[in-house]
Amino acid sequence: MEEFDSEDFSTSEEDEDYVPSGGEYSEDDINELVKEDEVDGEEETQKTKGTKRKAESVLARKRKQGGLSLEEDEEDANEESGGSSSEEEDAATEQQKGVESEDARKKKEDELWASFLNDVGPKSKVPPSTHVKTGEETEETSSSHLVKAERLEKPKETEKVKITKVFDFAGEEVRVIKEVDATSKEAKSFFKQNEKEKPQSNVPPAVPSLPAGSGLKRSSGMSSLLGKIGAKKQKMSTLEKSKLDWESFKEEEGIGEELAIHNRGKEGYIERKAFLDRVDHRQFEIERDLRLSKMKP
């Protein structure tokens, strides 16, 4: 047994160390090696084909994605165009509906007006001439009202009359020309005086003239003339003469408005005095009213 075991061990070692040469291969071994090479080549070709297929599939997927994106863009554009076209159609339909509603409303108004005219009858039909006349009448009335309003607004401008008065100042004759209203008392008295002083020569004599020998008539005529000549003129005081000179100077120089504006200011003595007088008078009236109210039971 021990020998057998040693032999077996030796044979096993020999088997491990033994390497067959190429000439010692059998046909079956060669066929198996060829098949293994072919299998390895097929696996490599399959691997390369798999990688190619993977690349092609990736490209195809990318193309498909690009196509999908393009298709999506086209669909969005189509949707937008469809939406705009639908909006235009809606606007057109709304416009058409509005026109139809306006037409229907006008038609309804015409029908109502026709029915109203039928109910009223021929009395409502008035000839156009009457309308024109009424329009003219209204225009005339409106114009007359406007004229009346203007007359009321505009105060009546009174006519001015120049009168001349003769005064005696220190033996000199002074003529004063004043411009007053025609309806004033001063103007009326001046006109009456002029009518009285008119010579009676313009008036035709009602009684035949007496002979020249009558001394009474001649004496009366001479006395009237002497009376007119020797009539006393109205005397003028120094204050009146200075006032007259000042007024004439203002008119010649044209400083009346400037003086009036100056007197209305703070430096105007006359205006200030008048204002203070008005204040005193108003204060007196208030005190009087208070006293009277206290005196009443």
From Swiss-Prot:
Residues 97-111, 147-157, 190-199 have a biased composition (Basic and acidic residues). Signal peptide: none annotated. Brain. There is a cross-link at residue 148 (Glycyl lysine isopeptide (Lys-Gly) (interchain with G-Cter in SUMO2)). Residues 176-215 are annotated as: Hydrophilic. InterPro entries: BCNT-C, Swc5/CFDP1/2. Keywords: Developmental protein, Isopeptide bond, Methylation, Phosphoprotein, Ubl conjugation. Residues 1-157, 190-222 are annotated as: Disordered. One of its GO terms (biological process) is chromatin remodeling. Residues 1-18, 25-43, 70-79 have a biased composition (Acidic residues). The modification Phosphoserine is found at residues 81, 84-85, 115, 214, 248. The keyword Manganese does not apply. One of its GO terms (cellular component) is Swr1 complex. PROSITE patterns: BCNT_C (PS51279). The modification N6-methyllysine is found at residue 217. Residues 216-297 form the BCNT-C domain. Gene duplication of the ancestral BCNT gene leads to the h-type BCNT (CFDP1) gene and the p97BCNT (CFDP2) gene. The latter contains a region derived from the endonuclease domain of a retrotransposable element RTE-1. This repetitive sequence associated with the BCNT gene is specific to Ruminantia. May play a role during embryogenesis. This is Craniofacial development protein 1. It comes from Bos taurus. The gene is CFDP1.
